[in-house]
């Protein structure tokens, strides 16, 4: 009887030493992801400085993103015969509605040519700058202006770029 009592006592002792944890809890969670429309940029209109007259002194024509022009040095902007088709470069940026994006303009000059005659375009500006926000329809108009450098006694003619300039947009 004593052996049975010791056996029961030992069993209860071992049972008392076993640990049952009541301090644990578990939960689950779902996973999701949203893919937004990729950002895109499309040219709507090429840049055009319009008509300018060169003199014996070099100068510049500044075209703002709003499409207004000013001049410095020996360049004049004739009022007779019209100004020509003056326009900043216009792009449509599209993507996810209400998202912001950064704008990267060229950092180097672009050369425009008329045969062997050349001029350079640089000092790029944009509206908006340096970031834009897409509207609720996912689009925004981006306008780019620049400065045209006209040489002294620049040869008359239509000057165009052989290589277009690049504007880059990226989501912020």
Where are these regions (language model features)?
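Positively charged n-region of N-terminal signal peptides that target proteins for export
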Residues: 1-4, 18
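Sec-dependent signal peptide hydrophobic core
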Residues: 5-12
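C-terminal segment of classical bacterial N-terminal signal peptides
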Residues: 14-22
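N-terminal small/polar-rich segments of proteins
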Residues: 22-104, 131-172
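Short aromatic-acidic-glycine turn motif
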Residues: 42, 110-120
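Short acidic, flexible loop segments centered on an aromatic residue
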Residues: 103-111
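Extracellular beta-sheet repeat scaffolds used for adhesion and glycan interaction
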Residues: 117-133
């Amino acid at each position: 009887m004593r052996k049975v009592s010791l056996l029961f006592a030992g069993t209860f002792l071992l049972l008392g030493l076993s640990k049952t944890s009541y301090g644990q809890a578990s939960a689950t969670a779902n996973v999701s992801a949203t893919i937004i429309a990729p950002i895109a940029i499309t040219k709507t209109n090429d840049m055009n400085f319009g008509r300018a007259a060169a003199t014996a002194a070099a100068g510049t024509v500044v075209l703002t993103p709003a499409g207004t022009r000013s001049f410095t040095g020996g360049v004049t902007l004739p009022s007779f015969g019209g100004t020509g088709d003056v326009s900043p470069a216009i792009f449509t940026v599209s993507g996810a509605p209400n998202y912001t994006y950064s704008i990267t303009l060229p950092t180097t000059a672009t050369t425009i040519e008329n045969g062997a005659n050349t001029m350079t375009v640089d000092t790029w500006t944009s509206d908006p700058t340096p970031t834009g926000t897409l509207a609720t329809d996912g689009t925004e108009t981006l306008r780019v202006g620049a400065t045209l450098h006209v040489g002294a006694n620049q040869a008359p003619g239509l000057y165009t770029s052989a290589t277009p300039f690049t504007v880059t947009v990226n989501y912020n």
